[in-house]
């Protein structure tokens, strides 16, 4: 069993949000609060510590009460750059990630990922849902050991960017969640409106 105090949560808010007109997605209003604040309030009780990966509007994210770390790599290279920024600063043995645009992920997600990581002797545990009868991984919802930092940096410096390709280089437990809607994110303003309805 992994104690929640041994896990740091990382909110991924460093993307370009090109499908949302390049606005800062984590700062978009959702039921009266920024999307990223919903993620922080959902993730916070599941972990011992929390931080945010963002590349714009850093003061607005810092006002949410968590340390904010930008990508070390330029040009919005994707979630793995956020993973690296978090792993470089993580002071617990494990780190779990959640994107800023998915405010309804399960309240027991972290404990379920942690249980699977231990049960399967894995280095990474990744959430998955079923869509149209097929298992679909949710690669930005994953728990990892922090000793994977060197592997991740090597992967990024080779020019690779796909989370699943990197994760599959390690022992990865896939954890199925029944409610696919819990992992619904807002990639466009229309999807954000749909989430609010």
From Swiss-Prot:
Comment text on domains = The N-terminal domain determines nucleotide recognition and specific binding, while the C-terminal domain determines the specific binding to the target protein.
Subcellular localization? Cytoplasm
Query: What are its GO biological-process terms?
Result: bis(molybdopterin guanine dinucleotide)molybdenum biosynthetic process
Question: Domain of life here?
Answer: Bacteria
Catalysis performed (reactions)? Mo-molybdopterin + GTP + H(+) = Mo-molybdopterin guanine dinucleotide + diphosphate
Q: State the oligomer form and interacting partners.
A: Monomer.
**Short name of any one Pfam family annotated for the protein:** NTP_transf_3
Which species does the entry assign this protein to? Bordetella pertussis (strain Tohama I / ATCC BAA-589 / NCTC 13251)
Q: Which residues bind GTP?
A: 12-14, 25, 53, 71, 101
Q: Which family does it belong to?
A: Belongs to the MobA family.
Cofactor needs = Mg(2+)
* Cellular component terms (Gene Ontology): cytoplasm
In Swiss-Prot or TrEMBL terms, this protein is called Molybdenum cofactor guanylyltransferase
Q: Does the keyword Magnesium apply?
A: yes
PANTHER family the UniProt entry points to: MOLYBDENUM COFACTOR GUANYLYLTRANSFERASE
**Keyword Nucleotide-binding carried by entry:** yes
Q: Which UniProt keywords apply?
A: Cytoplasm, GTP-binding, Magnesium, Metal-binding, Molybdenum cofactor biosynthesis, Nucleotide-binding, Transferase
What is known about what this protein does?
Transfers a GMP moiety from GTP to Mo-molybdopterin (Mo-MPT) cofactor (Moco or molybdenum cofactor) to form Mo-molybdopterin guanine dinucleotide (Mo-MGD) cofactor.
Q: Which HAMAP family match?
A: MobA
Residues that, per the record, bind Mg(2+): 101
EC numbers: 2.7.7.77
One GO molecular function term of this record is:
metal ion binding
């Amino acid at each position: 069993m992994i104690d929640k105090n041994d896990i740091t949560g990382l909110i991924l808010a460093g993307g370009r949000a090109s499908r949302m007109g390049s606005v800062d997605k984590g700062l978009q209003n959702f039921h009266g609060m920024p999307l990223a604040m919903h993620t922080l309030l959902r993730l916070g009780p599941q972990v011992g510590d929390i931080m945010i990966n963002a590349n714009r509007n850093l003061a607005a994210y810092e006002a949410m009460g968590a340390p904010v770390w930008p990508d070390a790599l330029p040009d919005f290279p994707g979630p793995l750059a956020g993973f690296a920024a978090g792993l470089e600063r993580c002071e617990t043995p494990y780190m779990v990630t959640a994107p800023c645009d998915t405010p309804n992920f399960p309240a027991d997600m972290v404990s379920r990922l942690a249980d699977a990581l231990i049960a399967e002797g894995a280095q990474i545990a990744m959430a998955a849902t079923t869509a149209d009868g097929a298992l679909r991984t949710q690669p930005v919802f994953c728990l990892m050991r922090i000793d994977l930092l060197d592997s991740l940096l090597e992967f990024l410096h080779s020019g690779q960017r796909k989370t699943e390709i990197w994760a599959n280089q390690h022992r990865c437990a896939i954890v199925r969640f029944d409610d696919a809607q819990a992992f619904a994110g807002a990639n466009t303003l229309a999807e954000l409106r749909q989430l609010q309805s």
